[in-house]
Amino acid sequence: MIFLGRGRPTPKNGVWGGFLATALLAGVSLRGQPVKPPGPEPVIDSGTVFRSDTRVVDLHATVMDSGGHLVTNLPRQAFTVYENGVQQMITNFKREDVPVSLGLIVDNSGSMRDKRSKVEAAALTLVKDSNPQDEVFVVNFNDEAYKDLPHGKDFTSDIKEMEEALKRIDSRGGTAMRDAIRFSIDHLKEKAHREKKVLVVVTDGNDNSSLVTLQNVVRASQQSGVLIYPVGLLSEEVPEEARRAQQALGALAEATGGETFFPKEVSEVERIAHTVAHNIRNQYSIVYTPADQSMDGTFRQIKVTVNAPGPLTVRSRSGYYATPDQAVGSTRAPAR
């Protein structure tokens, strides 16, 4: 066993590149050679796309009626996009079931021990309900995060491999959810083969072990264009902890255009899995070219509205930072 800077034994074949944070970690590589501690937090890469020196912004929008039902038959003319209050020109629009790069991020802390079997079953249900061309990876986390696909794969479409990864149970320790999400965002950015990217996060408590901040993860998620769907199996035994967890999960969903779920019982996770898969497959893809092409690093607030009968709700990412498209330092999760 090799012991890393956080005082926890790590499998011998693990690789720890250090999560992005102000704290410095001591690390060792596969062959025991020292790994340089991370430097200052790098500039986060923009989720916008550059084509011939023109920046475009990709959005994935979900539209629901007052009863919570998806509205999937709206034309392009029904949508209006605003950036910092200024109406933008939509250059591409479609509603179709496209394959996605999907990350399943599952809490493996001690408090999840009795819930894992139902959560694993629900995760597989989500995959089976999703587009058959989706590519999937699995990250289990307690006080550290592990990318757990067999043979060190980055993604798989094999249900048996996903099942094997989800069953790598080591339910103990704390909850480093933010670290796990930040790693997963970077993994999608570097390795994903699909344009649309989704993370589904299942946890039962407030983060108590991460090195990266919530602000860092929210910003990274906004820049990447990933949709985050958090599922919080939160206990009311410690109301203040549950409230903090609920706020953090809500912030991630709101920033990215995803949706939060707070089931009272773990048995409800199966139904939620069906809902999330259905939502992902019935969204609108909207592309616009910002009228303001300057790279001034400011936050650009995005608002999408719909002109159609009935009270409708639109979910999409809340904005992005106008920064140049450049590589971002990446976190690393050990493979087991």
Q: Where are these predicted regions, by residue range?
A:
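N-terminal cationic leader/targeting segments used for protein routing and processing
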Residues: N13-G14, P37
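Short, low-complexity interaction segments enriched in Ser/Thr/Pro/Gly
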Residues: P9-T10, V28, Q33
